[in-house]
Structure formats: C-alpha cells, structure tokens
C-alpha cells in the first residue's frame, strides 16, 4: 500500500509592516506628542496619588497630636504608644475592609491602655493594607503585619482584666498565644459567643461591633484586607 504524499507546505505570505505615519501637524511640531505623553503620565500619577490619599486614615483634630513611639522598622516600635486618648471622650473605630465597613465602639473604661494603643496605631496608618489572616467558625483575626499570626509591633500589652463581661458576637479583644503575653497589634472579633465556658486567659476586651454590621464580620475570610481605619471622637 502506498501512502499518500502530503502536498508541500507553502510559507504564508507576510505583509510588510506599515510604516508608522505621524500626523502632519506632529511632524511639523515634534514637541506635541511629547507634551501629550507628559500630560498622560501626569494624569496617571495624579490618579495614583489621589488613590493613596483616599486610603490614608482621616484623623480628627482631637487626635492630630497622637504620634507613635519611636519606630525602629516597618510596623515595629520601641515600646508602648504614648497616651493620647482622653477619659472624658468616646471613641469609635471604623474598619474599611474588602467585605464592607465594620464599626467598633471602643471601651477605654475597660481597657484604657489597649484602646489608646489601637487608636494611635490606627490614626498613624498601621493597619492599612493588613489582612485578616485567620477566620475560623467563631472569630476573625487581623492586625498582624506578617499575615501569619507571628507578627506584632515589637512590644506587648499589659493584661487588662474585665471580670464578668460576656464575649458575645461582635466582641473585640487582643490576641495572645497560650501562655504568652498579650500581642501589641493583633486583634480579633468574635462571630459567635466564646466557645465553651469562656476564656481561661485575659484577652483585653476593648470594644464591640455596633450598627448591625456582624454580617460583614461573618463574610470575612483569610486574605480579606483592612483598607484603612478611621477613628471618630465624641
């Protein structure tokens, strides 16, 4: 049996590339395309700057003087944040996340050092862009610059006990490893009541979610991000 021969392939004709022809006006005035390019670049950079400013936390005048302790590295400081909050004021934090906004009423009457620490970090942009690295059934956890549960601001917080308070859905506290100190920046928000009989260690209860926004908390999954945090004072 003779195999049929395949007809030899013919290379496709390739049309020569058309010469780029500039408009007559541009040929006479070569600076015009350069001017247009500069204008486009300026618009792009301007949009990026505007976006960056939009992600910056809005700082109320009462907190304009809230500065961090000496910074020794990215997301790292020498120690606790200087006291900035006032005992006669009320503070609310709004977390603008990839799943919607979460409003938290802060409780300095229960944990003044913790609330002050959170406020100072927030108004100085510490939490901007950080992810919620953990989100099991009953809570979500964020505030870790490393995004793996091992990070922090370079210092820890003292225990601030709140005897008798119930950890209901929407409660906000500070994370800690078993047997270790209270983390300086990692916080959690409960989606359900604390499992079992309640916590066996101090987790510095310092706030609660308000405004019926627990659906946004429940929607958070690992990898969701805090875009920015704003603090309001009343």
Regions found by a protein language model. Give the residues of each.
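Cyclophilin-like peptidyl-prolyl cis-trans isomerases
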Residues: 1-234
């Amino acid at each position: 049996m003779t195999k049929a021969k395949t007809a030899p392939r013919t290379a496709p004709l390739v049309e020569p590339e058309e010469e780029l022809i500039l408009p007559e006006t541009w040929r006479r005035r070569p600076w015009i395309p350069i001017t247009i390019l500069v204008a486009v670049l300026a618009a792009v950079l301007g949009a990026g700057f505007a976006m960056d400013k939009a992600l910056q936390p809005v700082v109320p005048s009462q907190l304009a003087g809230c500065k961090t302790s000496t910074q020794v590295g990215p997301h790292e400081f020498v120690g606790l944040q200087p006291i900035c909050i006032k005992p006669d004021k009320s503070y609310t934090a709004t977390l603008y996340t990839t799943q919607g906004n979460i409003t938290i009423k802060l409780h300095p009457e229960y944990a003044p050092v913790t609330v002050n620490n959170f406020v100072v970090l927030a108004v100085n942009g510490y939490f901007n862009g950080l992810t919620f690295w953990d989100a099991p059934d009953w809570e979500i956890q964020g505030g870790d610059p490393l995004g793996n549960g091992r990070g922090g601001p370079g210092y820890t917080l003292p225990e601030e006990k709140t005897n008798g308070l119930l950890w209901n859905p929407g409660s906000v506290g500070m994370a800690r490893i078993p047997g270790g100190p209270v983390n300086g920046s990692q916080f959690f928000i409960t989606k359900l009541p604390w499992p079992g009989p309640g916590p066996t260690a101090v987790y510095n209860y310092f706030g609660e979610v308000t405004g019926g926004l627990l659906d946004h908390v429940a929607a958070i999954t690992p990898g969701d991000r805090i875009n920015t945090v704003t603090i309001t004072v009343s």
